[in-house]
């Protein structure tokens, strides 16, 4: 929780191996509860089945393609995972790649629609590589950062 709380005013969250939301800081909680996602909910289910989430993301096709690649990468890293594979298969049936893999940008920001404004955030994801506790080893920490000045200013004003 220390890392998540210190990341305010920007969103930060922790998810488990199957993308269930385990913890979130104040900014992430505000962002996610606005689209119906709460602690304990599956971010995979939200990405696959929530019109509220999809409609709140301006660049959903780009983000969906990024999620698809991420799911396949995580499953391969784990030596195969039926839950991640099923989610990737479902998403692959719905999403057409927006660009060839060779031309994908290094960072795909997620652009959220928040009323009349658009908040553009990019993420870094960290995982504990030397954890002795398997539950801790399965946690991924996602720290979101503003991708533009407007987004930075909105988060600073809300939490300042």
Please state what every model-predicted region is.
Residues 2-3, 8-97, 114:
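PAS-family sensory domains
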Residues 74-75, 79, 93-160:
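Amphipathic alpha-helical interface segments
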Residues 6, 23, 39, 103, ...:
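Residue-level signal for the start and early helices of compact helical domains
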Residues 7-10, 105-107:
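Short beta-strand-initiation
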């Amino acid at each position: 929780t220390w890392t998540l709380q210190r990341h305010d005013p920007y969103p930060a969250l922790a998810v488990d191996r199957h993308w269930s939301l385990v913890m979130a800081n104040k900014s992430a909680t505000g962002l996610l509860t606005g689209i119906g996602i709460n602690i304990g909910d599956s971010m995979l289910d939200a990405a696959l089945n929530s019109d509220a989430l999809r409609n709140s993301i301006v660049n959903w096709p780009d983000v969906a393609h990024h999620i698809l690649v991420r799911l396949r990468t995580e499953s391969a890293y784990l030596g195969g995972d039926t839950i991640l594979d099923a989610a990737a298969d479902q998403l692959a049936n719905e999403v057409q790649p927006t660009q060839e893999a060779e031309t994908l940008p290094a960072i795909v920001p997620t652009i959220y629609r928040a009323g009349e404004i658009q908040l553009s955030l990019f993420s870094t994801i960290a995982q504990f590589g030397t954890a002795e506790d398997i539950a801790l080893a399965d946690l991924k920490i996602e720290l979101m950062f503003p991708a533009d000045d407007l987004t930075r200013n909105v988060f600073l004003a809300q939490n300042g």
